[in-house]
Structures are given as C-alpha cells and as structure tokens.
Regions:
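Long, low-complexity, intrinsically disordered polar/charged segments
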Residues: 1-12, 342-367
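Surface-exposed receptor/substrate recognition regions of extracellular proteins
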Residues: 1-65
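Structural signature of tandem-repeat unit edges
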Residues: 50-60, 70-85, 95-109, 119-133, ...
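Register-specific detector for alpha-helical tandem repeat solenoids, activating on a conserved position
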Residues: 64, 88-89, 112-113, 136-137, ...
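Extracellular/surface-exposed low-complexity segments
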Residues: 363-382
Length: 382
C-alpha cells in the first residue's frame, strides 16, 4: 500500500472530522459555530439512544428540554411520547417552531413551560392534558398564537403565567381552573376583550393575573373567598369599567398593592376587609372612579392619587393610620364621604397625633362640628 503524503493525511483527517460532525448533527446533537474538534468526543454522549432516525423513545417518561432551542423540531413526528409524564420545557425557546404535530400526552402530569418563548408558534394540536397538574408558563411568550384549542385542565393546580405575554391571544381559552391555587400572571398582557368563565374558588394567589390586558372590558363573576394576594391583579387594564364584588376573602389580611392602578375606565369598586396591609397605589390613576366601598384597611398617601372624580367613599370598617392619608387628589368627595372618612378613623387618643390630608377644597366643605370628629380622636386636618 502506498504511503500517503502529509497533505493527504491532513485532508483525510479533516474529512473524517467533518463526517463525525455531520453524524452528530444527524443524531440531533447541536454543534454551535466555533465548537472545537477536540470537543466532539464529549458531544457523542449527547446522542439520544438510537439517534433521531428510528429514535426509540417508547420508554421515555421525561421530555424535559427534549426539543429546546429548535433542536429536532423538523423530526418531532418521529418522537414517541406515549409514556411521557414530564413535558416541561420540551420546546423551550424554539423560535423557529411554527406548528406542532399531534403528540400522545395522555400520561402527562407536568406541562410547565412546554412552549415557553416559541414566538413563531401559530397553532398547537389538541393535546390530551387530562392528567396534568402543572401548567405554569406553558404558552408564555407565544406571541403569535391567536387561539388555543380546548384543553382539559380539570386536575391542574398550578396555572401561573400559563398565557403570559401571549400578546396576540384574542379569545378566552376557557380553561378549567377549579382546582387551581396559583393563577398569578395567568393572562398577563393578553389581547382579549372579555373572559367568559374563570373558576377561582380554590385560588389563593391572583397577583398580576390580568396585568396590562389593555383591551379587557368585562370579567365574569368570580368566587375569590380564598384569595389573599391581589398585587397588580388588574393594573393597566385601561378599558375595564367594572369588577364584580369579588373581595370577600376571609383571611386576616389581603394584599391590594397596585391592584387597580391605571384602570382609567373603572367607575366603581367594592372591597371587603383588607386587614393590616396598606393600600399602596391601589387606586392610583383611576381617573374615572366615582365610588369606593371598602372594609378595614391601613392608610398610605398614594392610595387615591389621580382619582379626581371620586365622589363616594364608603368605609364599612375601621381605618388605621400609617404614615399618611391623602385625599386632596379627590376634590369631588361629598360631605357625607368626608364625614364617613373621619368617623372611620381609629381613635388615637392617648397616643401621638396624626395628620389627615383632605385638601383645601374638601376642608372648605366641612363645618367646625364635622372637623371636630377627627380632632377629638387626636388627628389634625390639612
């Protein structure tokens, strides 16, 4: 056999390395640009059993990150998912994925982040999700999705961020959330105008659920008796005109920070006892708000900032002073409302004095006798 020249040996080595690289790619292993040939050996360990062609995943239970970052997306139909229980992050960050073939997900229990950040995805199949319990962030960041097929989520408990940032989603997916305890960020920044049904009877966390749903106009009646966290729930729902009487939580304290901030079309709100938590920015920027009925709460200065049309303030519980209380932003408060406020404040006799800021316009509406209500409880008025 003739001895090869140095040049021929080098060319053969290059050819062999290219063959190894192509074989790895054919087996579904990513070889990013700039990967050193010395790293190819380690890459061999990433090959799925049997490779992509004829891939035997019939006994696989976890498809965690299986097709993430566009991996294998052109061969999804060859993947046997019949025994899969964990589909979390399966297609995570597959920004080239536009559609998904029918998958057998009948045994799936977790679908968390399955399609997270699949920004080009336009359709999803009718998945069997009847055994699913975790749907957190399932479609988060799917900005091209306009509709979702009816999914069986009757056993789901975690729905946090399921449709978060689905900015093109225009129709209510009508999911069953009867067992859901965490619905936070559920419809964050979605594009539909109405929600026809939402079972919140088991929910404790509704924070950010409808944040920035700027087209949302109506909500269904909801049982929120177990909810304690309403942080930013309806913030920036700029077309929402009315919310049902939903704040009937039986706990000692509920969080209402920023709950209705910038709900610029909201006209009326009825809330039960808040407890010891302050109302930080709760109604800030609610420029059309006319009536507020609220139970016991703790004050902060920013609660009613920008509520220039507020007329009726109906406290049904005791107001506890903390730091400050300022309704000077609300020059249209009725005399009855102003008296209601002064009457509801907790008596500070024997303690340090505190200042209630009503504003000059509101102060001018009160008689000396009415102002005395606050003075007798160790408050000054400004």
């Amino acid at each position: 056999m003739a001895t090869k020249t140095l040049s021929e040996n080098i060319n053969q080595a290059i050819s062999d390395l290219n063959s190894v690289k192509q074989a790895l790619i054919d087996k579904g292993v990513e070889i990013p640009s700039g990967t050193k040939t010395s790293e190819y050996g380690a890459k061999i360990g990433e090959i799925q059993s049997g490779g992509v062609t004829g891939l035997d995943t019939s006994n696989e239970t976890s498809f965690y990150y299986f097709c993430s970052s566009n991996r294998l997306i052109d061969q999804i139909e060859k993947i046997n998912t019949s025994n899969g229980t964990d589909f979390s992050f399966m297609f995570y960050y597959s920004k080239l994925l536009t559609t998904v073939p029918q998958l057998n997900t009948s045994k799936g229990t977790t679908f968390a982040s399955m399609f997270y950040d699949c920004s080009a995805l336009t359709t999803v199949p009718q998945l069997n999700t009847s055994s699913g319990t975790n749907f957190g962030n399932m479609f988060r960041g799917c900005t091209s999705l306009t509709a979702i097929p009816q999914l069986d989520t009757s056993n789901g408990t975690m729905f946090s961020g399921m449709f978060r940032d689905c900015t093109s989603l225009k129709t209510d997916p009508k999911i069953n959330t009867s067992k859901g305890t965490d619905l936070s960020y559920l419809f964050y920044d979605c594009a539909f105008k109405t929600i026809e049904q939402l079972d919140t009877s088991s929910c404790t966390n509704l924070s950010y659920a409808f944040y920035s749903c700027s087209l949302l106009e109506t909500l269904p009646e909801m049982d929120l008796s177990k909810v304690t966290n309403y942080t930013d729930t309806f913030r920036s729902c700029s077309k929402l005109q009315k919310v049902p009487e939903i704040f009937n939580a039986k706990g000692t304290s509920i969080n209402l920070n920023n709950t209705f901030q910038s709900c610029s079309k909201l006209t009326e709100v009825k809330i039960g006892n808040v407890g010891t938590n302050p109302l930080n920015n709760t109604f800030r920027g609610c420029s059309e708000l006319v009536t507020v009925e609220i139970g016991s709460f703790t004050t902060v200065s920013s609660t009613f900032m920008g509520c220039s049309k507020l007329e009726n303030f109906i406290p049904t519980g005791e107001i506890t002073f903390s730091n400050s209380f300022d309704v000077s932003y609300c020059p249209n408060l009725t005399v009855e409302s102003l008296v209601n406020i002064l009457t509801a404040f907790k008596d500070r006799s024997g303690g340090s004095s505190a200042k209630i800021t009503l504003g000059s316009t509101n102060l001018a509406k009160l008689t000396a006798e009415q102002k005395q209500i606050a003075i007798d409880k160790n408050y000054t008025l400004a």
